[in-house]
Amino acid sequence: MTTRQPIYKSLYFQVIVAIVIGILLGHFYPETGVALKPLGDGFIKLIKMVIAPIIFCTVVSGIAGMQSMKSVGKTGGYALLYFEIVSTVALLIGLIVVNVVQPGAGMHIDVATLDASKVAAYVTAGKDQSIVGFILNVIPNTIVGAFANGDILQVLMFSVIFGFALHRLGAYGKPVLDFIDRFAHVMFNIINMIMKLAPIGALGAMAFTIGAYGVGSLVQLGQLMICFYITCLLFVLVVLGGICRAHGFSVIKLIRYIREELLIVLGTSSSESALPRMLIKMERLGAKKSVVGLVIPTGYSFNLDGTSIYLTMAAVFIAQATDTHMDITHQITLLLVLLLSSKGAAGVTGSGFIVLAATLSAVGHLPVAGLALILGIDRFMSEARALTNLVGNAVATIVVAKWVKELDTDKLQSELASGGTGISETREIDDLGVAEGPAPVVK
């Protein structure tokens, strides 16, 4: 029997309180808020420290433990198909909404008056991104380099190859697989220790955001922000909600189940901060480890629904604000470019904003200097992007697992019905098969 823990001990309550305190500190004591930035940065760095080994262990254990290698290719193929369809829908929705609402209309901004120097670094980084460059970048120069740099796609590629190789060894490779499983348990224990610091990280990150940019900076471009937030909400409830209903579960129950991860993302504005816990929770929802290990990390580059909505809305908003005419041909061109450029969003520093700069440079018709318009509020829009991305990847994992018949639907329904109440760190580790005491000797 699971005992419900007091609310003040729950992570989501602590993070909520931390976010509120951070907002108040940043608003009333902005200098103090800015000074707390290292708290948020430090927490995210702690999470990033263990992401690479956790992805490696999860993917290798999942692939090496599978009966047939054909199922790996099948899972990857279905995942990419899902990513392409849903992210395209997200791009289209952003394009439609920004054309209907027209948040930038009437601003009549003269491009010549904008300070292009503020966005020069983003434009330079954006120009460095190309399709061929992105594909080649997936291949690490060295194995150590992939882990040292924490590049998710590079680590994922090596992990898949390692998993295949380990599977081919059969019984001879079992000691290696056993070691990797035990190492994974150590990593997840480290994550549980780090997550105790989540409220502190959320407080520091939120205090810095409000202290550095101020609530007042939201007013000038508030219409775009409101439009974007509402669009993301509707996308989650209508599009993702419809996908969930078609596959026999509720997106509302799923959101409730991952509420702690969502609050961590809200506080830190980094969806990466929730990646390790998402691997645990998706597996506990009934998806096989092999599916979770492939879909979640890959989704961080190829299934960024919130970023897709942001990219089309921001690009057309700049055109509207600067009175740059965009006919249907220009908008179709923009959409086609974004279908490619958006897939590398998580692989570059600065994520969506740099991809937006790369897109404007590639399209050519839109003024790149217009990026200065949204530079000030981009930080405030990153929360909605990250939250939508996280929910989108959670839905994708369950759907793909069901498509490839690697989902325990009874477990899914029972876990969602529980709402994640009473989940403790001990239970998380127990679900991974770790017992108290010394590890048994492998003979």
Curated annotation (Swiss-Prot):
It comes from the Bacteria. Its main location: membrane. The chain crosses the membrane at residues 10-30, 46-66, 78-98, 143-163, 199-219, 224-244, 291-311, 332-352, 354-374. SUPFAM superfamilies: Proton glutamate symport protein. InterPro entries: C4_dicarb_transport, Na-dicarboxylate_symporter, Na-dicarboxylate_symporter_CS, Na:dicarbo_symporter_sf. GO terms for biological process: L-aspartate transmembrane transport. It is a multi-pass membrane protein. GO terms for cellular component: plasma membrane. It is found in: Cell inner membrane. Keywords: Cell inner membrane, Cell membrane, Membrane, Symport, Transmembrane, Transmembrane helix, Transport. The keyword Membrane applies. GO terms for molecular function: fumarate transmembrane transporter activity; malate:proton symporter activity; succinate transmembrane transporter activity. Belongs to the dicarboxylate/amino acid:cation symporter (DAACS) (TC 2.A.23) family. Responsible for the transport of dicarboxylates such as succinate, fumarate, and malate from the periplasm across the membrane. This is C4-dicarboxylate transport protein. It comes from Pseudomonas fluorescens (strain SBW25).
